[in-house]
Amino acid sequence: MIQKETNLVVADNSGAKKVRCIHVFGGTGRRYAGLGDQVIVSVKAAVPGGVVKKKDVCKAVVVRCAKEQRRKDGSYIRFDENAVVLLNAQGEPRGTRIFGPVARELRDRKYMKIVSLAPEVL
């Protein structure tokens, strides 16, 4: 579960390394974001020469979440870290590579570009 002020790892090669959630999409009172949900993040650490710089504000989608999430078949999925992939204005990933596994819930949410770039879908 991701909420405001949650520190996240970036799972793509857009140039950002660490980001912080500053808003969760989905209505006024929505507090938490899970796998496949969109958030607005602020870049806290970035590599020199990357597409994004420190202090940039951009949209992102949650691809790994440390809090277990229940699936329709009754199983649970959880990861070791909270990770996001940065998105452009059209909702496509800003980077050209995805690092680490991503959740199957992204396929249900129509993030097919992220699913195809990911090395593993769990």
UniProtKB/Swiss-Prot annotation:
Domain of life: Bacteria
GO cellular component: cytosolic large ribosomal subunit
Protein name: Large ribosomal subunit protein uL14
A single GO molecular function term of this UniProt record: large ribosomal subunit rRNA binding
Pfam family, one: Ribosomal_L14
GO biological process: translation
Keywords: Ribonucleoprotein, Ribosomal protein, RNA-binding, rRNA-binding
InterPro entries: Ribosomal_uL14, Ribosomal_uL14_bac-type, Ribosomal_uL14_CS, Ribosomal_uL14_sf
Similarity comment: family membership: Belongs to the universal ribosomal protein uL14 family.
Function: Binds to 23S rRNA. Forms part of two intersubunit bridges in the 70S ribosome.
Organism: Chlorobium limicola (strain DSM 245 / NBRC 103803 / 6330)
Subunit and interaction comment: Part of the 50S ribosomal subunit. Forms a cluster with proteins L3 and L19. In the 70S ribosome, L14 and L19 interact and together make contacts with the 16S rRNA in bridges B5 and B8.
CDD domains associated with the record: Ribosomal_uL14
UniProt cross-references to SUPFAM superfamilies, sorted A to Z: Ribosomal protein L14
